Amino acid sequence: MTVTKEAPEVMPFEGLTEEINLMSDNERVWWQKTGSMLSRVLSSADYTWKEQHKHLKFYAQVLLPHLGPYPQSFRSSITRSGLPFELSINYQQNGNPLVVRIGFEPLNALSGTPDDPFNQAPAAEVLSLLDQMHIPGFDSQIWDKAVEHHTVNHTEREALRDSDLGAGYIRSQTAYGFDLLRDGNIAVKGYSFPALKCQITGQSMAQMMAGLVADLAPLVDCSQAFAIVDEYLQDTGYDERAFFSWDFVEPSRSRLKLYTGSSSVTWGKLAEVWTLGNRVQNPTVARGLEYLRQLFDLIKLSDGQRNIVVAFDDRQDSSKETPLLWNYEMRAGDPTPLTKIYFPVHGENDLQVINGVAEFLCQIGLSHGKTYVEKVKSYYPGIDLSTTERFTSWVSFAYTEKTGVYLSTYYHSSTDNPWKMTTEEDSQL
């Protein structure tokens, strides 16, 4: 008797490419360039076939139509290159399954034009879609407050119409984050970028952040934790490009996060940021600081003051210098803010970075470290990561008693390589 071998199952990306009805050439190009990356990352994080299929389908049907024209003309502030899409993977020392996440700024053909100079309409369209999806626990009350406080209104848009905004790095007003959960559901996060609002209203970034936190207090009272954060940032200086984040859940359960940055990338600055200038001291913070030093040494970040050019890095000869970034997470009823630091690895040798992360994962007891290097290489077939410096974007680090080390790695998330070409070569096309 002849036994026939069962044909291998079609991978979710290939199956969906045949199954879904992509409505335009733009969607088809974006799907090949970003959907394929999402597929590789989901597979590398050991998502099941069913989980991969569900999340890829969500991406194709809900997000992909809101990437707008290809190639894009509006540059998003969520990535150094201006790409409106960024993938990351979260690792937890306690052994929880890996979680793939999407950072996303919706775009359309009018983004950046006089009809929508600051790309506000697409975000509202996506919010409407999310409202209709019946996501468990989904709540947009904080979004409404953040949009009111942190984004420009019609009158302000008109006042800015003739303003010189330079490279436009602060044009983005809002963005979304999506955690692709193992049960097939998604968790949604929101982001607001108040820099433009500060410019037109004359309010400082400190005033802008304090105003929103105070207005949110009846819904989610984080005033005690914010007081510590604000005192530290008043002492050291609020970054003019700071931004804000929250969860789309019932407000009292939401985390509030204030993101800020510095051009100083030194161990002394990291330790200061971690403890808010010694304002937060306890055994958990001390243990986290030890792990933070371990990771800092393994990644081998260039140590010193960085010359930051506020512009996108989307060509071979554009500036790759990237600032230190961090956020302070605040929860209702908890007087102590939690620090998460984002190592600015964009601009560092990619293989050096991924080797350092792999070794760190092994040292903290996660077997993912053994296969990490090869998995990251699989995202970029045909590219020698020992010769590149821009495919790894950020490595973030936090530490709690519950999760242990909480580490996320962020990647350039398109098959396009914008850094193959110089600005002059691009202008001649």
Swiss-Prot record:
InterPro entries: Aro_prenylTrfase, Aro_prenylTrfase_DMATS, DMATS-type_fun
Pathway annotation from the record: Alkaloid biosynthesis
Molecular function as annotated in GO: prenyltransferase activity
Enzyme Commission code: 2.5.1.-
Keyword Transferase: yes
Biological process according to GO: alkaloid metabolic process
Record-linked Pfam families: Trp_DMAT
Keyword Transferase: yes
Deletion consequences: Abolishes the production of okaramine B and leads to the accumulation of cyclo(L-Trp-L-Trp).
Keywords, ordered alphabetically: Prenyltransferase, Transferase
Site positions for Required for regioselectivity: 103
UniProt: dimethylallyl diphosphate binding residues: 101, 189, 191, 257, 259, 342, 406, 410
Catalytic activity: cyclo(L-Trp-L-Trp) + 2 dimethylallyl diphosphate = cyclo(N(8)-(alpha,alpha-dimethylallyl)-L-Trp-6a-(alpha,alpha-dimethylallyl)-L-Trp) + 2 diphosphate
NCBIfam families referenced in this protein's UniProt entry, alphabetically: arom_pren_DMATS
Function: Prenyltransferase; part of the gene cluster that mediates the biosynthesis of okaramine B, a prenylated indole alkaloid that possesses an unusual octacyclic ring system, including a four-membered azetidine ring and an eight-membered azocine ring, and that exhibits insecticidal activity against silkworm larvae.
Family: Belongs to the tryptophan dimethylallyltransferase family.
Matches recorded under PANTHER family: INDOLE PRENYLTRANSFERASE TDIB-RELATED, PRENYLTRANSFERASE ASQH2-RELATED
Protein name: Prenyltransferase okaC
Source organism: Penicillium ochrochloron
